[in-house]
């Protein structure tokens, strides 16, 4: 096998555990576009504090758990991170985010839902070690793509419009 090809192959698909190669697979995550009738045209946005994507803007979300539906994951993540419940939860889009030089490959499913004001007040930052805090940000006034967490930047590149009437 050509050395350059082997290097790329190893980077993309193999890791070593106990001296044996193991297949690497992309992670699967959920990003949640939380909207609110009291904040028209806005979504809930936070700023990451963790190593991966530190300092970039993110939506609520995280890893999908084994056996969990997309809807269940979205509800769980926004409850864990912001203490809110959603209504009218639905599929938004999906992105495939790859940065081999950072050993990063995630498929992110974006769900969209409205803040359920019959249950929830304003979102609160329940994971201050991971996020600087939540704020409502107009979709049209988002930070530039280079300041967004990679999956969110990829969603913006798709020209996804969460407030477009279908």
Locate the predicted segments by residue.
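Short connector loops at helix/strand junctions that flank enzyme active sites
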Residues: 25-29, 54, 59, 86, ...
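N-terminal mitochondrial targeting presequence
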Residues: 1-10
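Short active-site-proximal "capping" loops at secondary-structure junctions
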Residues: 50-52, 94-97
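Unchanged
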Residues: 64-87, 95-151
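Conserved N-terminal beta-strand and adjoining loop/helix that marks the start
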Residues: 16-43, 94, 109-114
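Conserved Nudix-box catalytic region and its N-terminal flanking loop in Nudix hydrolases
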Residues: 40-80
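Charged phosphate-binding loop/patch that engages nucleotide di/tri-phosphates or the phosphate backbone
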Residues: 152-166
């Amino acid at each position: 096998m050509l050395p350059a090809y082997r290097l790329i192959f190893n980077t993309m698909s193999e890791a070593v555990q106990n001296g044996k190669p193991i297949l690497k697979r992309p992670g699967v995550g959920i990003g949640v576009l939380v909207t609110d009738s009291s904040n028209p045209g806005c979504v809930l946005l936070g700023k990451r504090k963790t190593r991966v994507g530190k300092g970039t803007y993110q939506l609520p979300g995280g890893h999908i758990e084994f056996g969990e539906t997309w809807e269940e994951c979205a509800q769980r993540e926004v409850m864990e991170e912001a203490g809110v419940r959603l209504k009218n939860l639905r599929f938004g889009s999906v992105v495939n985010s790859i940065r081999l030089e950072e050993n990063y490959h995630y498929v992110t499913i974006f769900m969209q839902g409205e803040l359920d004001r019959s249950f929830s007040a304003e979102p609160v930052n329940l994971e201050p070690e991971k996020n600087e805090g939540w704020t409502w940000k107009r979709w049209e006034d988002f930070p530039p793509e280079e300041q967004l967490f990679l999956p969110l930047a990829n969603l913006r590149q798709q020209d996804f419009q969460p407030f477009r009437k279908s």
